[in-house]
Swiss-Prot record:
Belongs to the universal ribosomal protein uS8 family. One of its GO terms (molecular function) is rRNA binding. Part of the 30S ribosomal subunit. Contacts proteins S5 and S12. One of its GO terms (cellular component) is ribosome. One of its GO terms (biological process) is translation. This is Small ribosomal subunit protein uS8. InterPro entries: Ribosomal_uS8, Ribosomal_uS8_CS, Ribosomal_uS8_sf. HAMAP family: Ribosomal_uS8_B (MF_01302_B). One of the primary rRNA binding proteins, it binds directly to 16S rRNA central domain where it helps coordinate assembly of the platform of the 30S subunit.
Amino acid sequence: MSMQDPIADMLTRIRNGQAANKVSVKMPSAKLKVAIAKLLKDEGYITDYAVASEGNKAELEVTLKYFQGRPVVETIQRVSRPGLRIYKGKDELPKVMGGLGIAIVSTSKGLMTDRAARLAGMGGEVICYVA
């Protein structure tokens, strides 16, 4: 069976891994998934990520982050999905948890956080919320 929404699968693997107190989670790799992992690392939500190639299949391993035994990622939620794309202009970009969380936005300049997109004066597709 083919995977309908690989980004939702990635976010669910991270959510489930942290609920089970796993050190890391593995998933099939893709450019968009690596870009999301890079943003999560830059914003301090995960410890690290690595891409390993096994034959013709690349695998993304995300090392999860905990603070005092609790997951750093409290909520991670898919917004735009294949059946219902959500686009927001630069003035309509949401502030997640009043600015404490981030929204990952796909713009014409690549993936960036909602703060970076506002500073760049760009809108785009809202991929997910992380808090």
